[in-house]
Amino acid sequence: MTTPPNGPTTNAKSPAQMAPTQRNLLLFAGMAALLIMVGVLQSWNVAFSILNMCLISAIMALGVNIQWGYAGLFNVGVMGFAALGGLAGVVVSMPPVDAAWAAGGLGIIMGLATGIATLIAGMMVWRRGQSWGRWRYAATAVIVISGYILMRSLADPSVAAIEAVDPARTGYLGGLGLPIILSWLVGGVFAAAAAWVVGKVSLGLRADYLAIATLGISEIIIYVLKFEDWLSRGVKNVNGLPRPVPYEVDLQANSWFIALADTLNLPLVDASSLVVKICYALLFTVVLLAVLWLSETALRSPWGRMMRAIRDNETAANAMGKNVTKQHLLVFVLGSAVIGVAGAMMVKLDGQFTPTSYQPLRFTFLIWVMVIAGGSGNNWGAVLGGFLIWFFWIEAEPIGLWLMDVVTSGLPPTHWLRLHLLESAAHTRLMTMGVILLLVLRFSPRGLIPESRR
């Protein structure tokens, strides 16, 4: 007869010993608890503001995960594709500026048509003139230079005329005045079209050179949006973008909403702001779930298994007859389209298109931290990483201020060290991201929700 061990027995498991499903549920429950804590300790308006950007960040992280987690493509041009999504919001939803179209719309169309025709003609001559020897270079150069001169001669006077039309309020062509939700799809199309061009040029490069190429092209896209005022107002920004949810002032003017705010014992302004944020959260959740479902379906399909095989061993996949370059281009376009959708959603949440806010190095780093920390190759991991990293990106400042206030509470209020630490605490965001990344890589190198073994 065996003797029972001394002391009580326990069946509790550490998070690392849990089944993957239990562990994932625990992680998402912890994320929800963090958002609830913000609502209780700060305000629900702040909590839903963070939640909305977490949802957009999760969609953007899914786009990067499609490229890197599925195919191993190192895309550092994330902000360029997000900016194209933002441009789609302007082009689709803003009303057209009739005076600007009358002043130079025809010239812009003719200039763009000339530029496209020049590119097509140059490509055709380059491909078909392989037997021409040196004349091939000369003919291509003549076509490109003459086409460029003709394009500028048509477009430049029109650009000047458009930008002179009430530059304080417009100074650009405006948009099509279509429903705002449509811009989310168009944002994906814009980003996908740009990704196709970028992919045709750069996907033959090795990973490190591909990263440099995508970063450079992203900078070019943002540079164009900053300085082509006729298209996007440049650094003057486009304000007052339509949005798919009610405006706060409209809610505040309704008697039923006033009664609802009184019932909830909330100030009218706070209640209207909260309802608008909840509406955004519902819309963004629908989009996130749709993208997540499509991503999971693709990942579990034969195509998804083929992409993972290409990622793990390109040489073997190529030897088995798979067109690696074609599949890389496809997955690059799909991931960029998802990023473009997220970019279009972001400008609708902000209500303005600000080209200067797209900082490739800073925010591309943030999206990559989301994917790496959440779990590369796992869609649920990308979603969790999007939520977790954006939450701490926003909350790093108040947490840092509170921590420094506690640490220096024993010092006089005017002590130089206390003042210095309190002033510096607001700039701990990047350090916080680095600490989170190091902790994840140390204790869970494959991410919080790693790619499942198949």
Where are these regions (language model features)?
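Transmembrane alpha-helices and adjacent helix-loop boundaries
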Residues: 2-454
